[in-house]
A protein has these predicted regions:
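Bilobed periplasmic-binding protein-like "clamshell/Venus-flytrap" ligand-binding domains
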Residues: 172-184
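Substrate-binding rim/cap in mid-to-C-terminal beta-strand-loop elements of soluble/periplasmic
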Residues: 1-39, 43-53, 68, 79-81
Length: 192
């Protein structure tokens, strides 16, 4: 990520701290003296840019219907679906669209209104069973990569102690992100 923050007067330097794109909005808002909304995730990067002060221990990432991934900057853990996990895959939306098409009549016929999430500000959402691409895993494999020794993520490693720590980060961040219960089931995890 390339970022310039006039508050820091830093230019042409690298940082090692783990940041995410979601940190951009709070950084820009605070630069202009505006407090981010309470449900906005991410951190102001002013101190990270100035002197590499960390803002997080781990970051959650992935794509809808794919692996749930977490990194601590050293390791990347990619959690695959468990057998039968696709039965727990749903689309949660108020805009019943796939990327290129509307939801079908059959899909909408199976939809139900459910309580929303912290970021839907009290609105209920449609819960639609996942169908089509992105609703069944391309692989059920789980991977752990050591970026220090395999930056290209070509050779997964086996390390139960690291995997346990990464699962802890993943569960903690999924809970903080208000992940719906079925995703914990599809990934073979339980909430703490």
């Amino acid at each position: 990520m390339f970022i310039w923050d006039p508050r820091s007067k830093k230019c042409g330097e690298r940082r090692k701290s783990l940041v995410q794109n979601i940190d951009m909005a709070p950084t820009i808002l605070r630069y202009f003296g505006i407090e981010p909304p309470k449900d906005m995730q991410g951190f102001d990067l002013e101190r990270t840019i100035r002197d590499d002060t960390p803002v997080r221990e781990a970051a959650l990432f992935g794509i809808h219907g794919g692996h749930v991934n977490v990194t601590d900057g050293r390791y990347v853990y990619m959690r695959g679906w468990v057998e039968g996990g696709e039965a727990c895959h749903y689309n949660y939306t108020l805009t019943p669209m796939h990327i290129h098409t509307r939801f079908s009549v059959e899909e909408l016929g199976q939809a139900e209104y459910v309580d929303g999430f912290s970021f839907t500000k009290g609105l209920k959402v449609l819960k639609v069973p996942g169908t089509g691409r992105g609703s069944s895993p391309q692989t059920r494999e789980t991977f752990l990569f050591d970026l220090e020794n395999d930056y290209g993520q070509m050779d997964p490693v086996q390390d139960s102690e690291v995997e346990e720590r990464m699962i802890h980060y993943m569960l903690q961040l999924m809970q903080e992100n208000d992940a719906p219960e079925p995703i914990f089931v599809s990934e073979g995890c339980c909430r703490n």
